[in-house]
């Protein structure tokens, strides 16, 4: 990673990003031929970080997800929601074919980014957790039609952060500090087909069986979380989860 914490006091602007990453790829050519709505969403402004999760700038979703920029060290903030029903079944989604990154792959309930807006940006861990919870409410409604009233802010539980990097197709990829959020709720779905192709609820046993099915493809971050921590957390969902909450250290994957 080429950034250092010495830059964290700079104003969070596009101009500061160009100073930090003078060779950053800002071209629009990679978006040619993709779905119009997904192209529009690539203009959303993500929070760019140093390796300690301190905001150092902003950049569009497109810029953050180009492998040419990821290979230069560009890192951004993200979140992953794991929503369980009252049977402790986990809601999965299959990403839509229209998605530019990781299309058609199965993943956890919702995976996205807090935006550089006052309600979702934070420089302290406490403020950052609050920001990703608000972002999670926003995206659960956008992707799955889940109303905020069914997923109250105070019902989200923050577990930890993971820092990982994963290519998608050679052109696109992920390099994120990902906030892991659990919530238990029975919800009504109204799927946005431009975002989500399918959904299903799984048990730990059925999910492990699906991992052995070569016809099913899962996102790399979901597999990382499953292979390292998820099943232990899941086992303690109703009793004992407290000891896993609010981890301060970033897990490097």
Curated annotation (Swiss-Prot):
Residues that hold Mg(2+) according to the record: 65, 76, 174, 176
Residues in Nudix hydrolase domain copies: 74-224
UniProt entry keywords in alphabetical sequence: Isomerase, Isoprene biosynthesis, Lipid biosynthesis, Lipid metabolism, Magnesium, Metal-binding, Steroid biosynthesis, Steroid metabolism, Sterol biosynthesis, Sterol metabolism
Any one GO CC term of the record: cytoplasm
InterPro entries xrefs: IsopentenylPP_isomerase_typ1, NUDIX_hydrolase-like_dom_sf, NUDIX_hydrolase_dom
Pathway per the UniProt entry: Isoprenoid biosynthesis; dimethylallyl diphosphate biosynthesis; dimethylallyl diphosphate from isopentenyl diphosphate: step 1/1
GO MF entries: isopentenyl-diphosphate delta-isomerase activity; metal ion binding
Short motif Nudix box, span: 112-145
Disulfide bonds, paired cysteine numbers: none
Cofactor(s) essential for the protein: Mg(2+)
Record EC number: 5.3.3.2
Catalytic class of the enzyme: isomerase
Binding site for substrate: 61, 94, 99, 112
Gene Ontology biological process: dimethylallyl diphosphate biosynthetic process; isopentenyl diphosphate biosynthetic process; sterol biosynthetic process
Cofactor note text: Binds 1 Mg(2+) ion per subunit.
Catalytic activity of the protein: isopentenyl diphosphate = dimethylallyl diphosphate
Residues the record marks as active site: 111, 176
Function: Isopentenyl-diphosphate delta-isomerase; part of the second module of ergosterol biosynthesis pathway that includes the middle steps of the pathway. IDI1 catalyzes the 1,3-allylic rearrangement of isopentenyl (IPP) to its highly electrophilic allylic isomer, dimethylallyl diphosphate (DMAPP). The second module is carried out in the vacuole and involves the formation of farnesyl diphosphate, which is also an important intermediate in the biosynthesis of ubiquinone, dolichol, heme and prenylated proteins.
Family of this protein: Belongs to the IPP isomerase type 1 family.
Record-given protein name: Isopentenyl-diphosphate delta-isomerase IDI1
Organism: Gibberella zeae (strain ATCC MYA-4620 / CBS 123657 / FGSC 9075 / NRRL 31084 / PH-1)
């Amino acid at each position: 990673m080429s950034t250092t914490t010495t830059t964290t006091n700079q104003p969070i602007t596009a101009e500061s990003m160009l100073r930090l990453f003078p060779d950053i790829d800002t071209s629009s050519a990679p978006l040619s031929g993709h779905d119009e709505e997904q192209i529009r969403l690539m203009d959303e402004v993500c929070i760019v970080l140093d390796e300690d999760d301190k905001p150092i700038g902003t950049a569009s979703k497109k810029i953050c997800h180009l492998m040419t920029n990821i290979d230069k060290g560009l890192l951004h903030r993200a979140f992953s929601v794991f929503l369980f029903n009252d049977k402790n079944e986990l809601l999965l989604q299959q990403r839509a074919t229209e998605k530019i990154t990781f299309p058609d792959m199965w993943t956890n309930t919702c995976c996205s980014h807090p935006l550089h807006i006052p309600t979702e940006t934070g420089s302290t861990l406490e403020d950052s957790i609050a920001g990703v919870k608000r972002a999670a409410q926003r995206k659960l409604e956008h992707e799955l039609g889940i109303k905020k009233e069914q997923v109250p802010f105070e019902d989200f539980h923050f577990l930890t952060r993971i820092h990982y990097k994963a290519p998608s197709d050679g052109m696109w990829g992920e390099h994120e500090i990902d906030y892991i959020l659990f919530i238990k709720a029975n919800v009504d779905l109204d799927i946005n087909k431009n975002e989500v192709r399918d959904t299903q609820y799984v048990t730990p046993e059925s999910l492990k069986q699906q991992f052995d099915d070569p016809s099913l493809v899962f996102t790399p971050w979901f597999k990382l979380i499953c292979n390292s921590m998820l099943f232990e957390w899941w086992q303690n969902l109703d009793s004992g989860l407290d000891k896993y909450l609010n981890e301060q250290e970033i897990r490097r994957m």
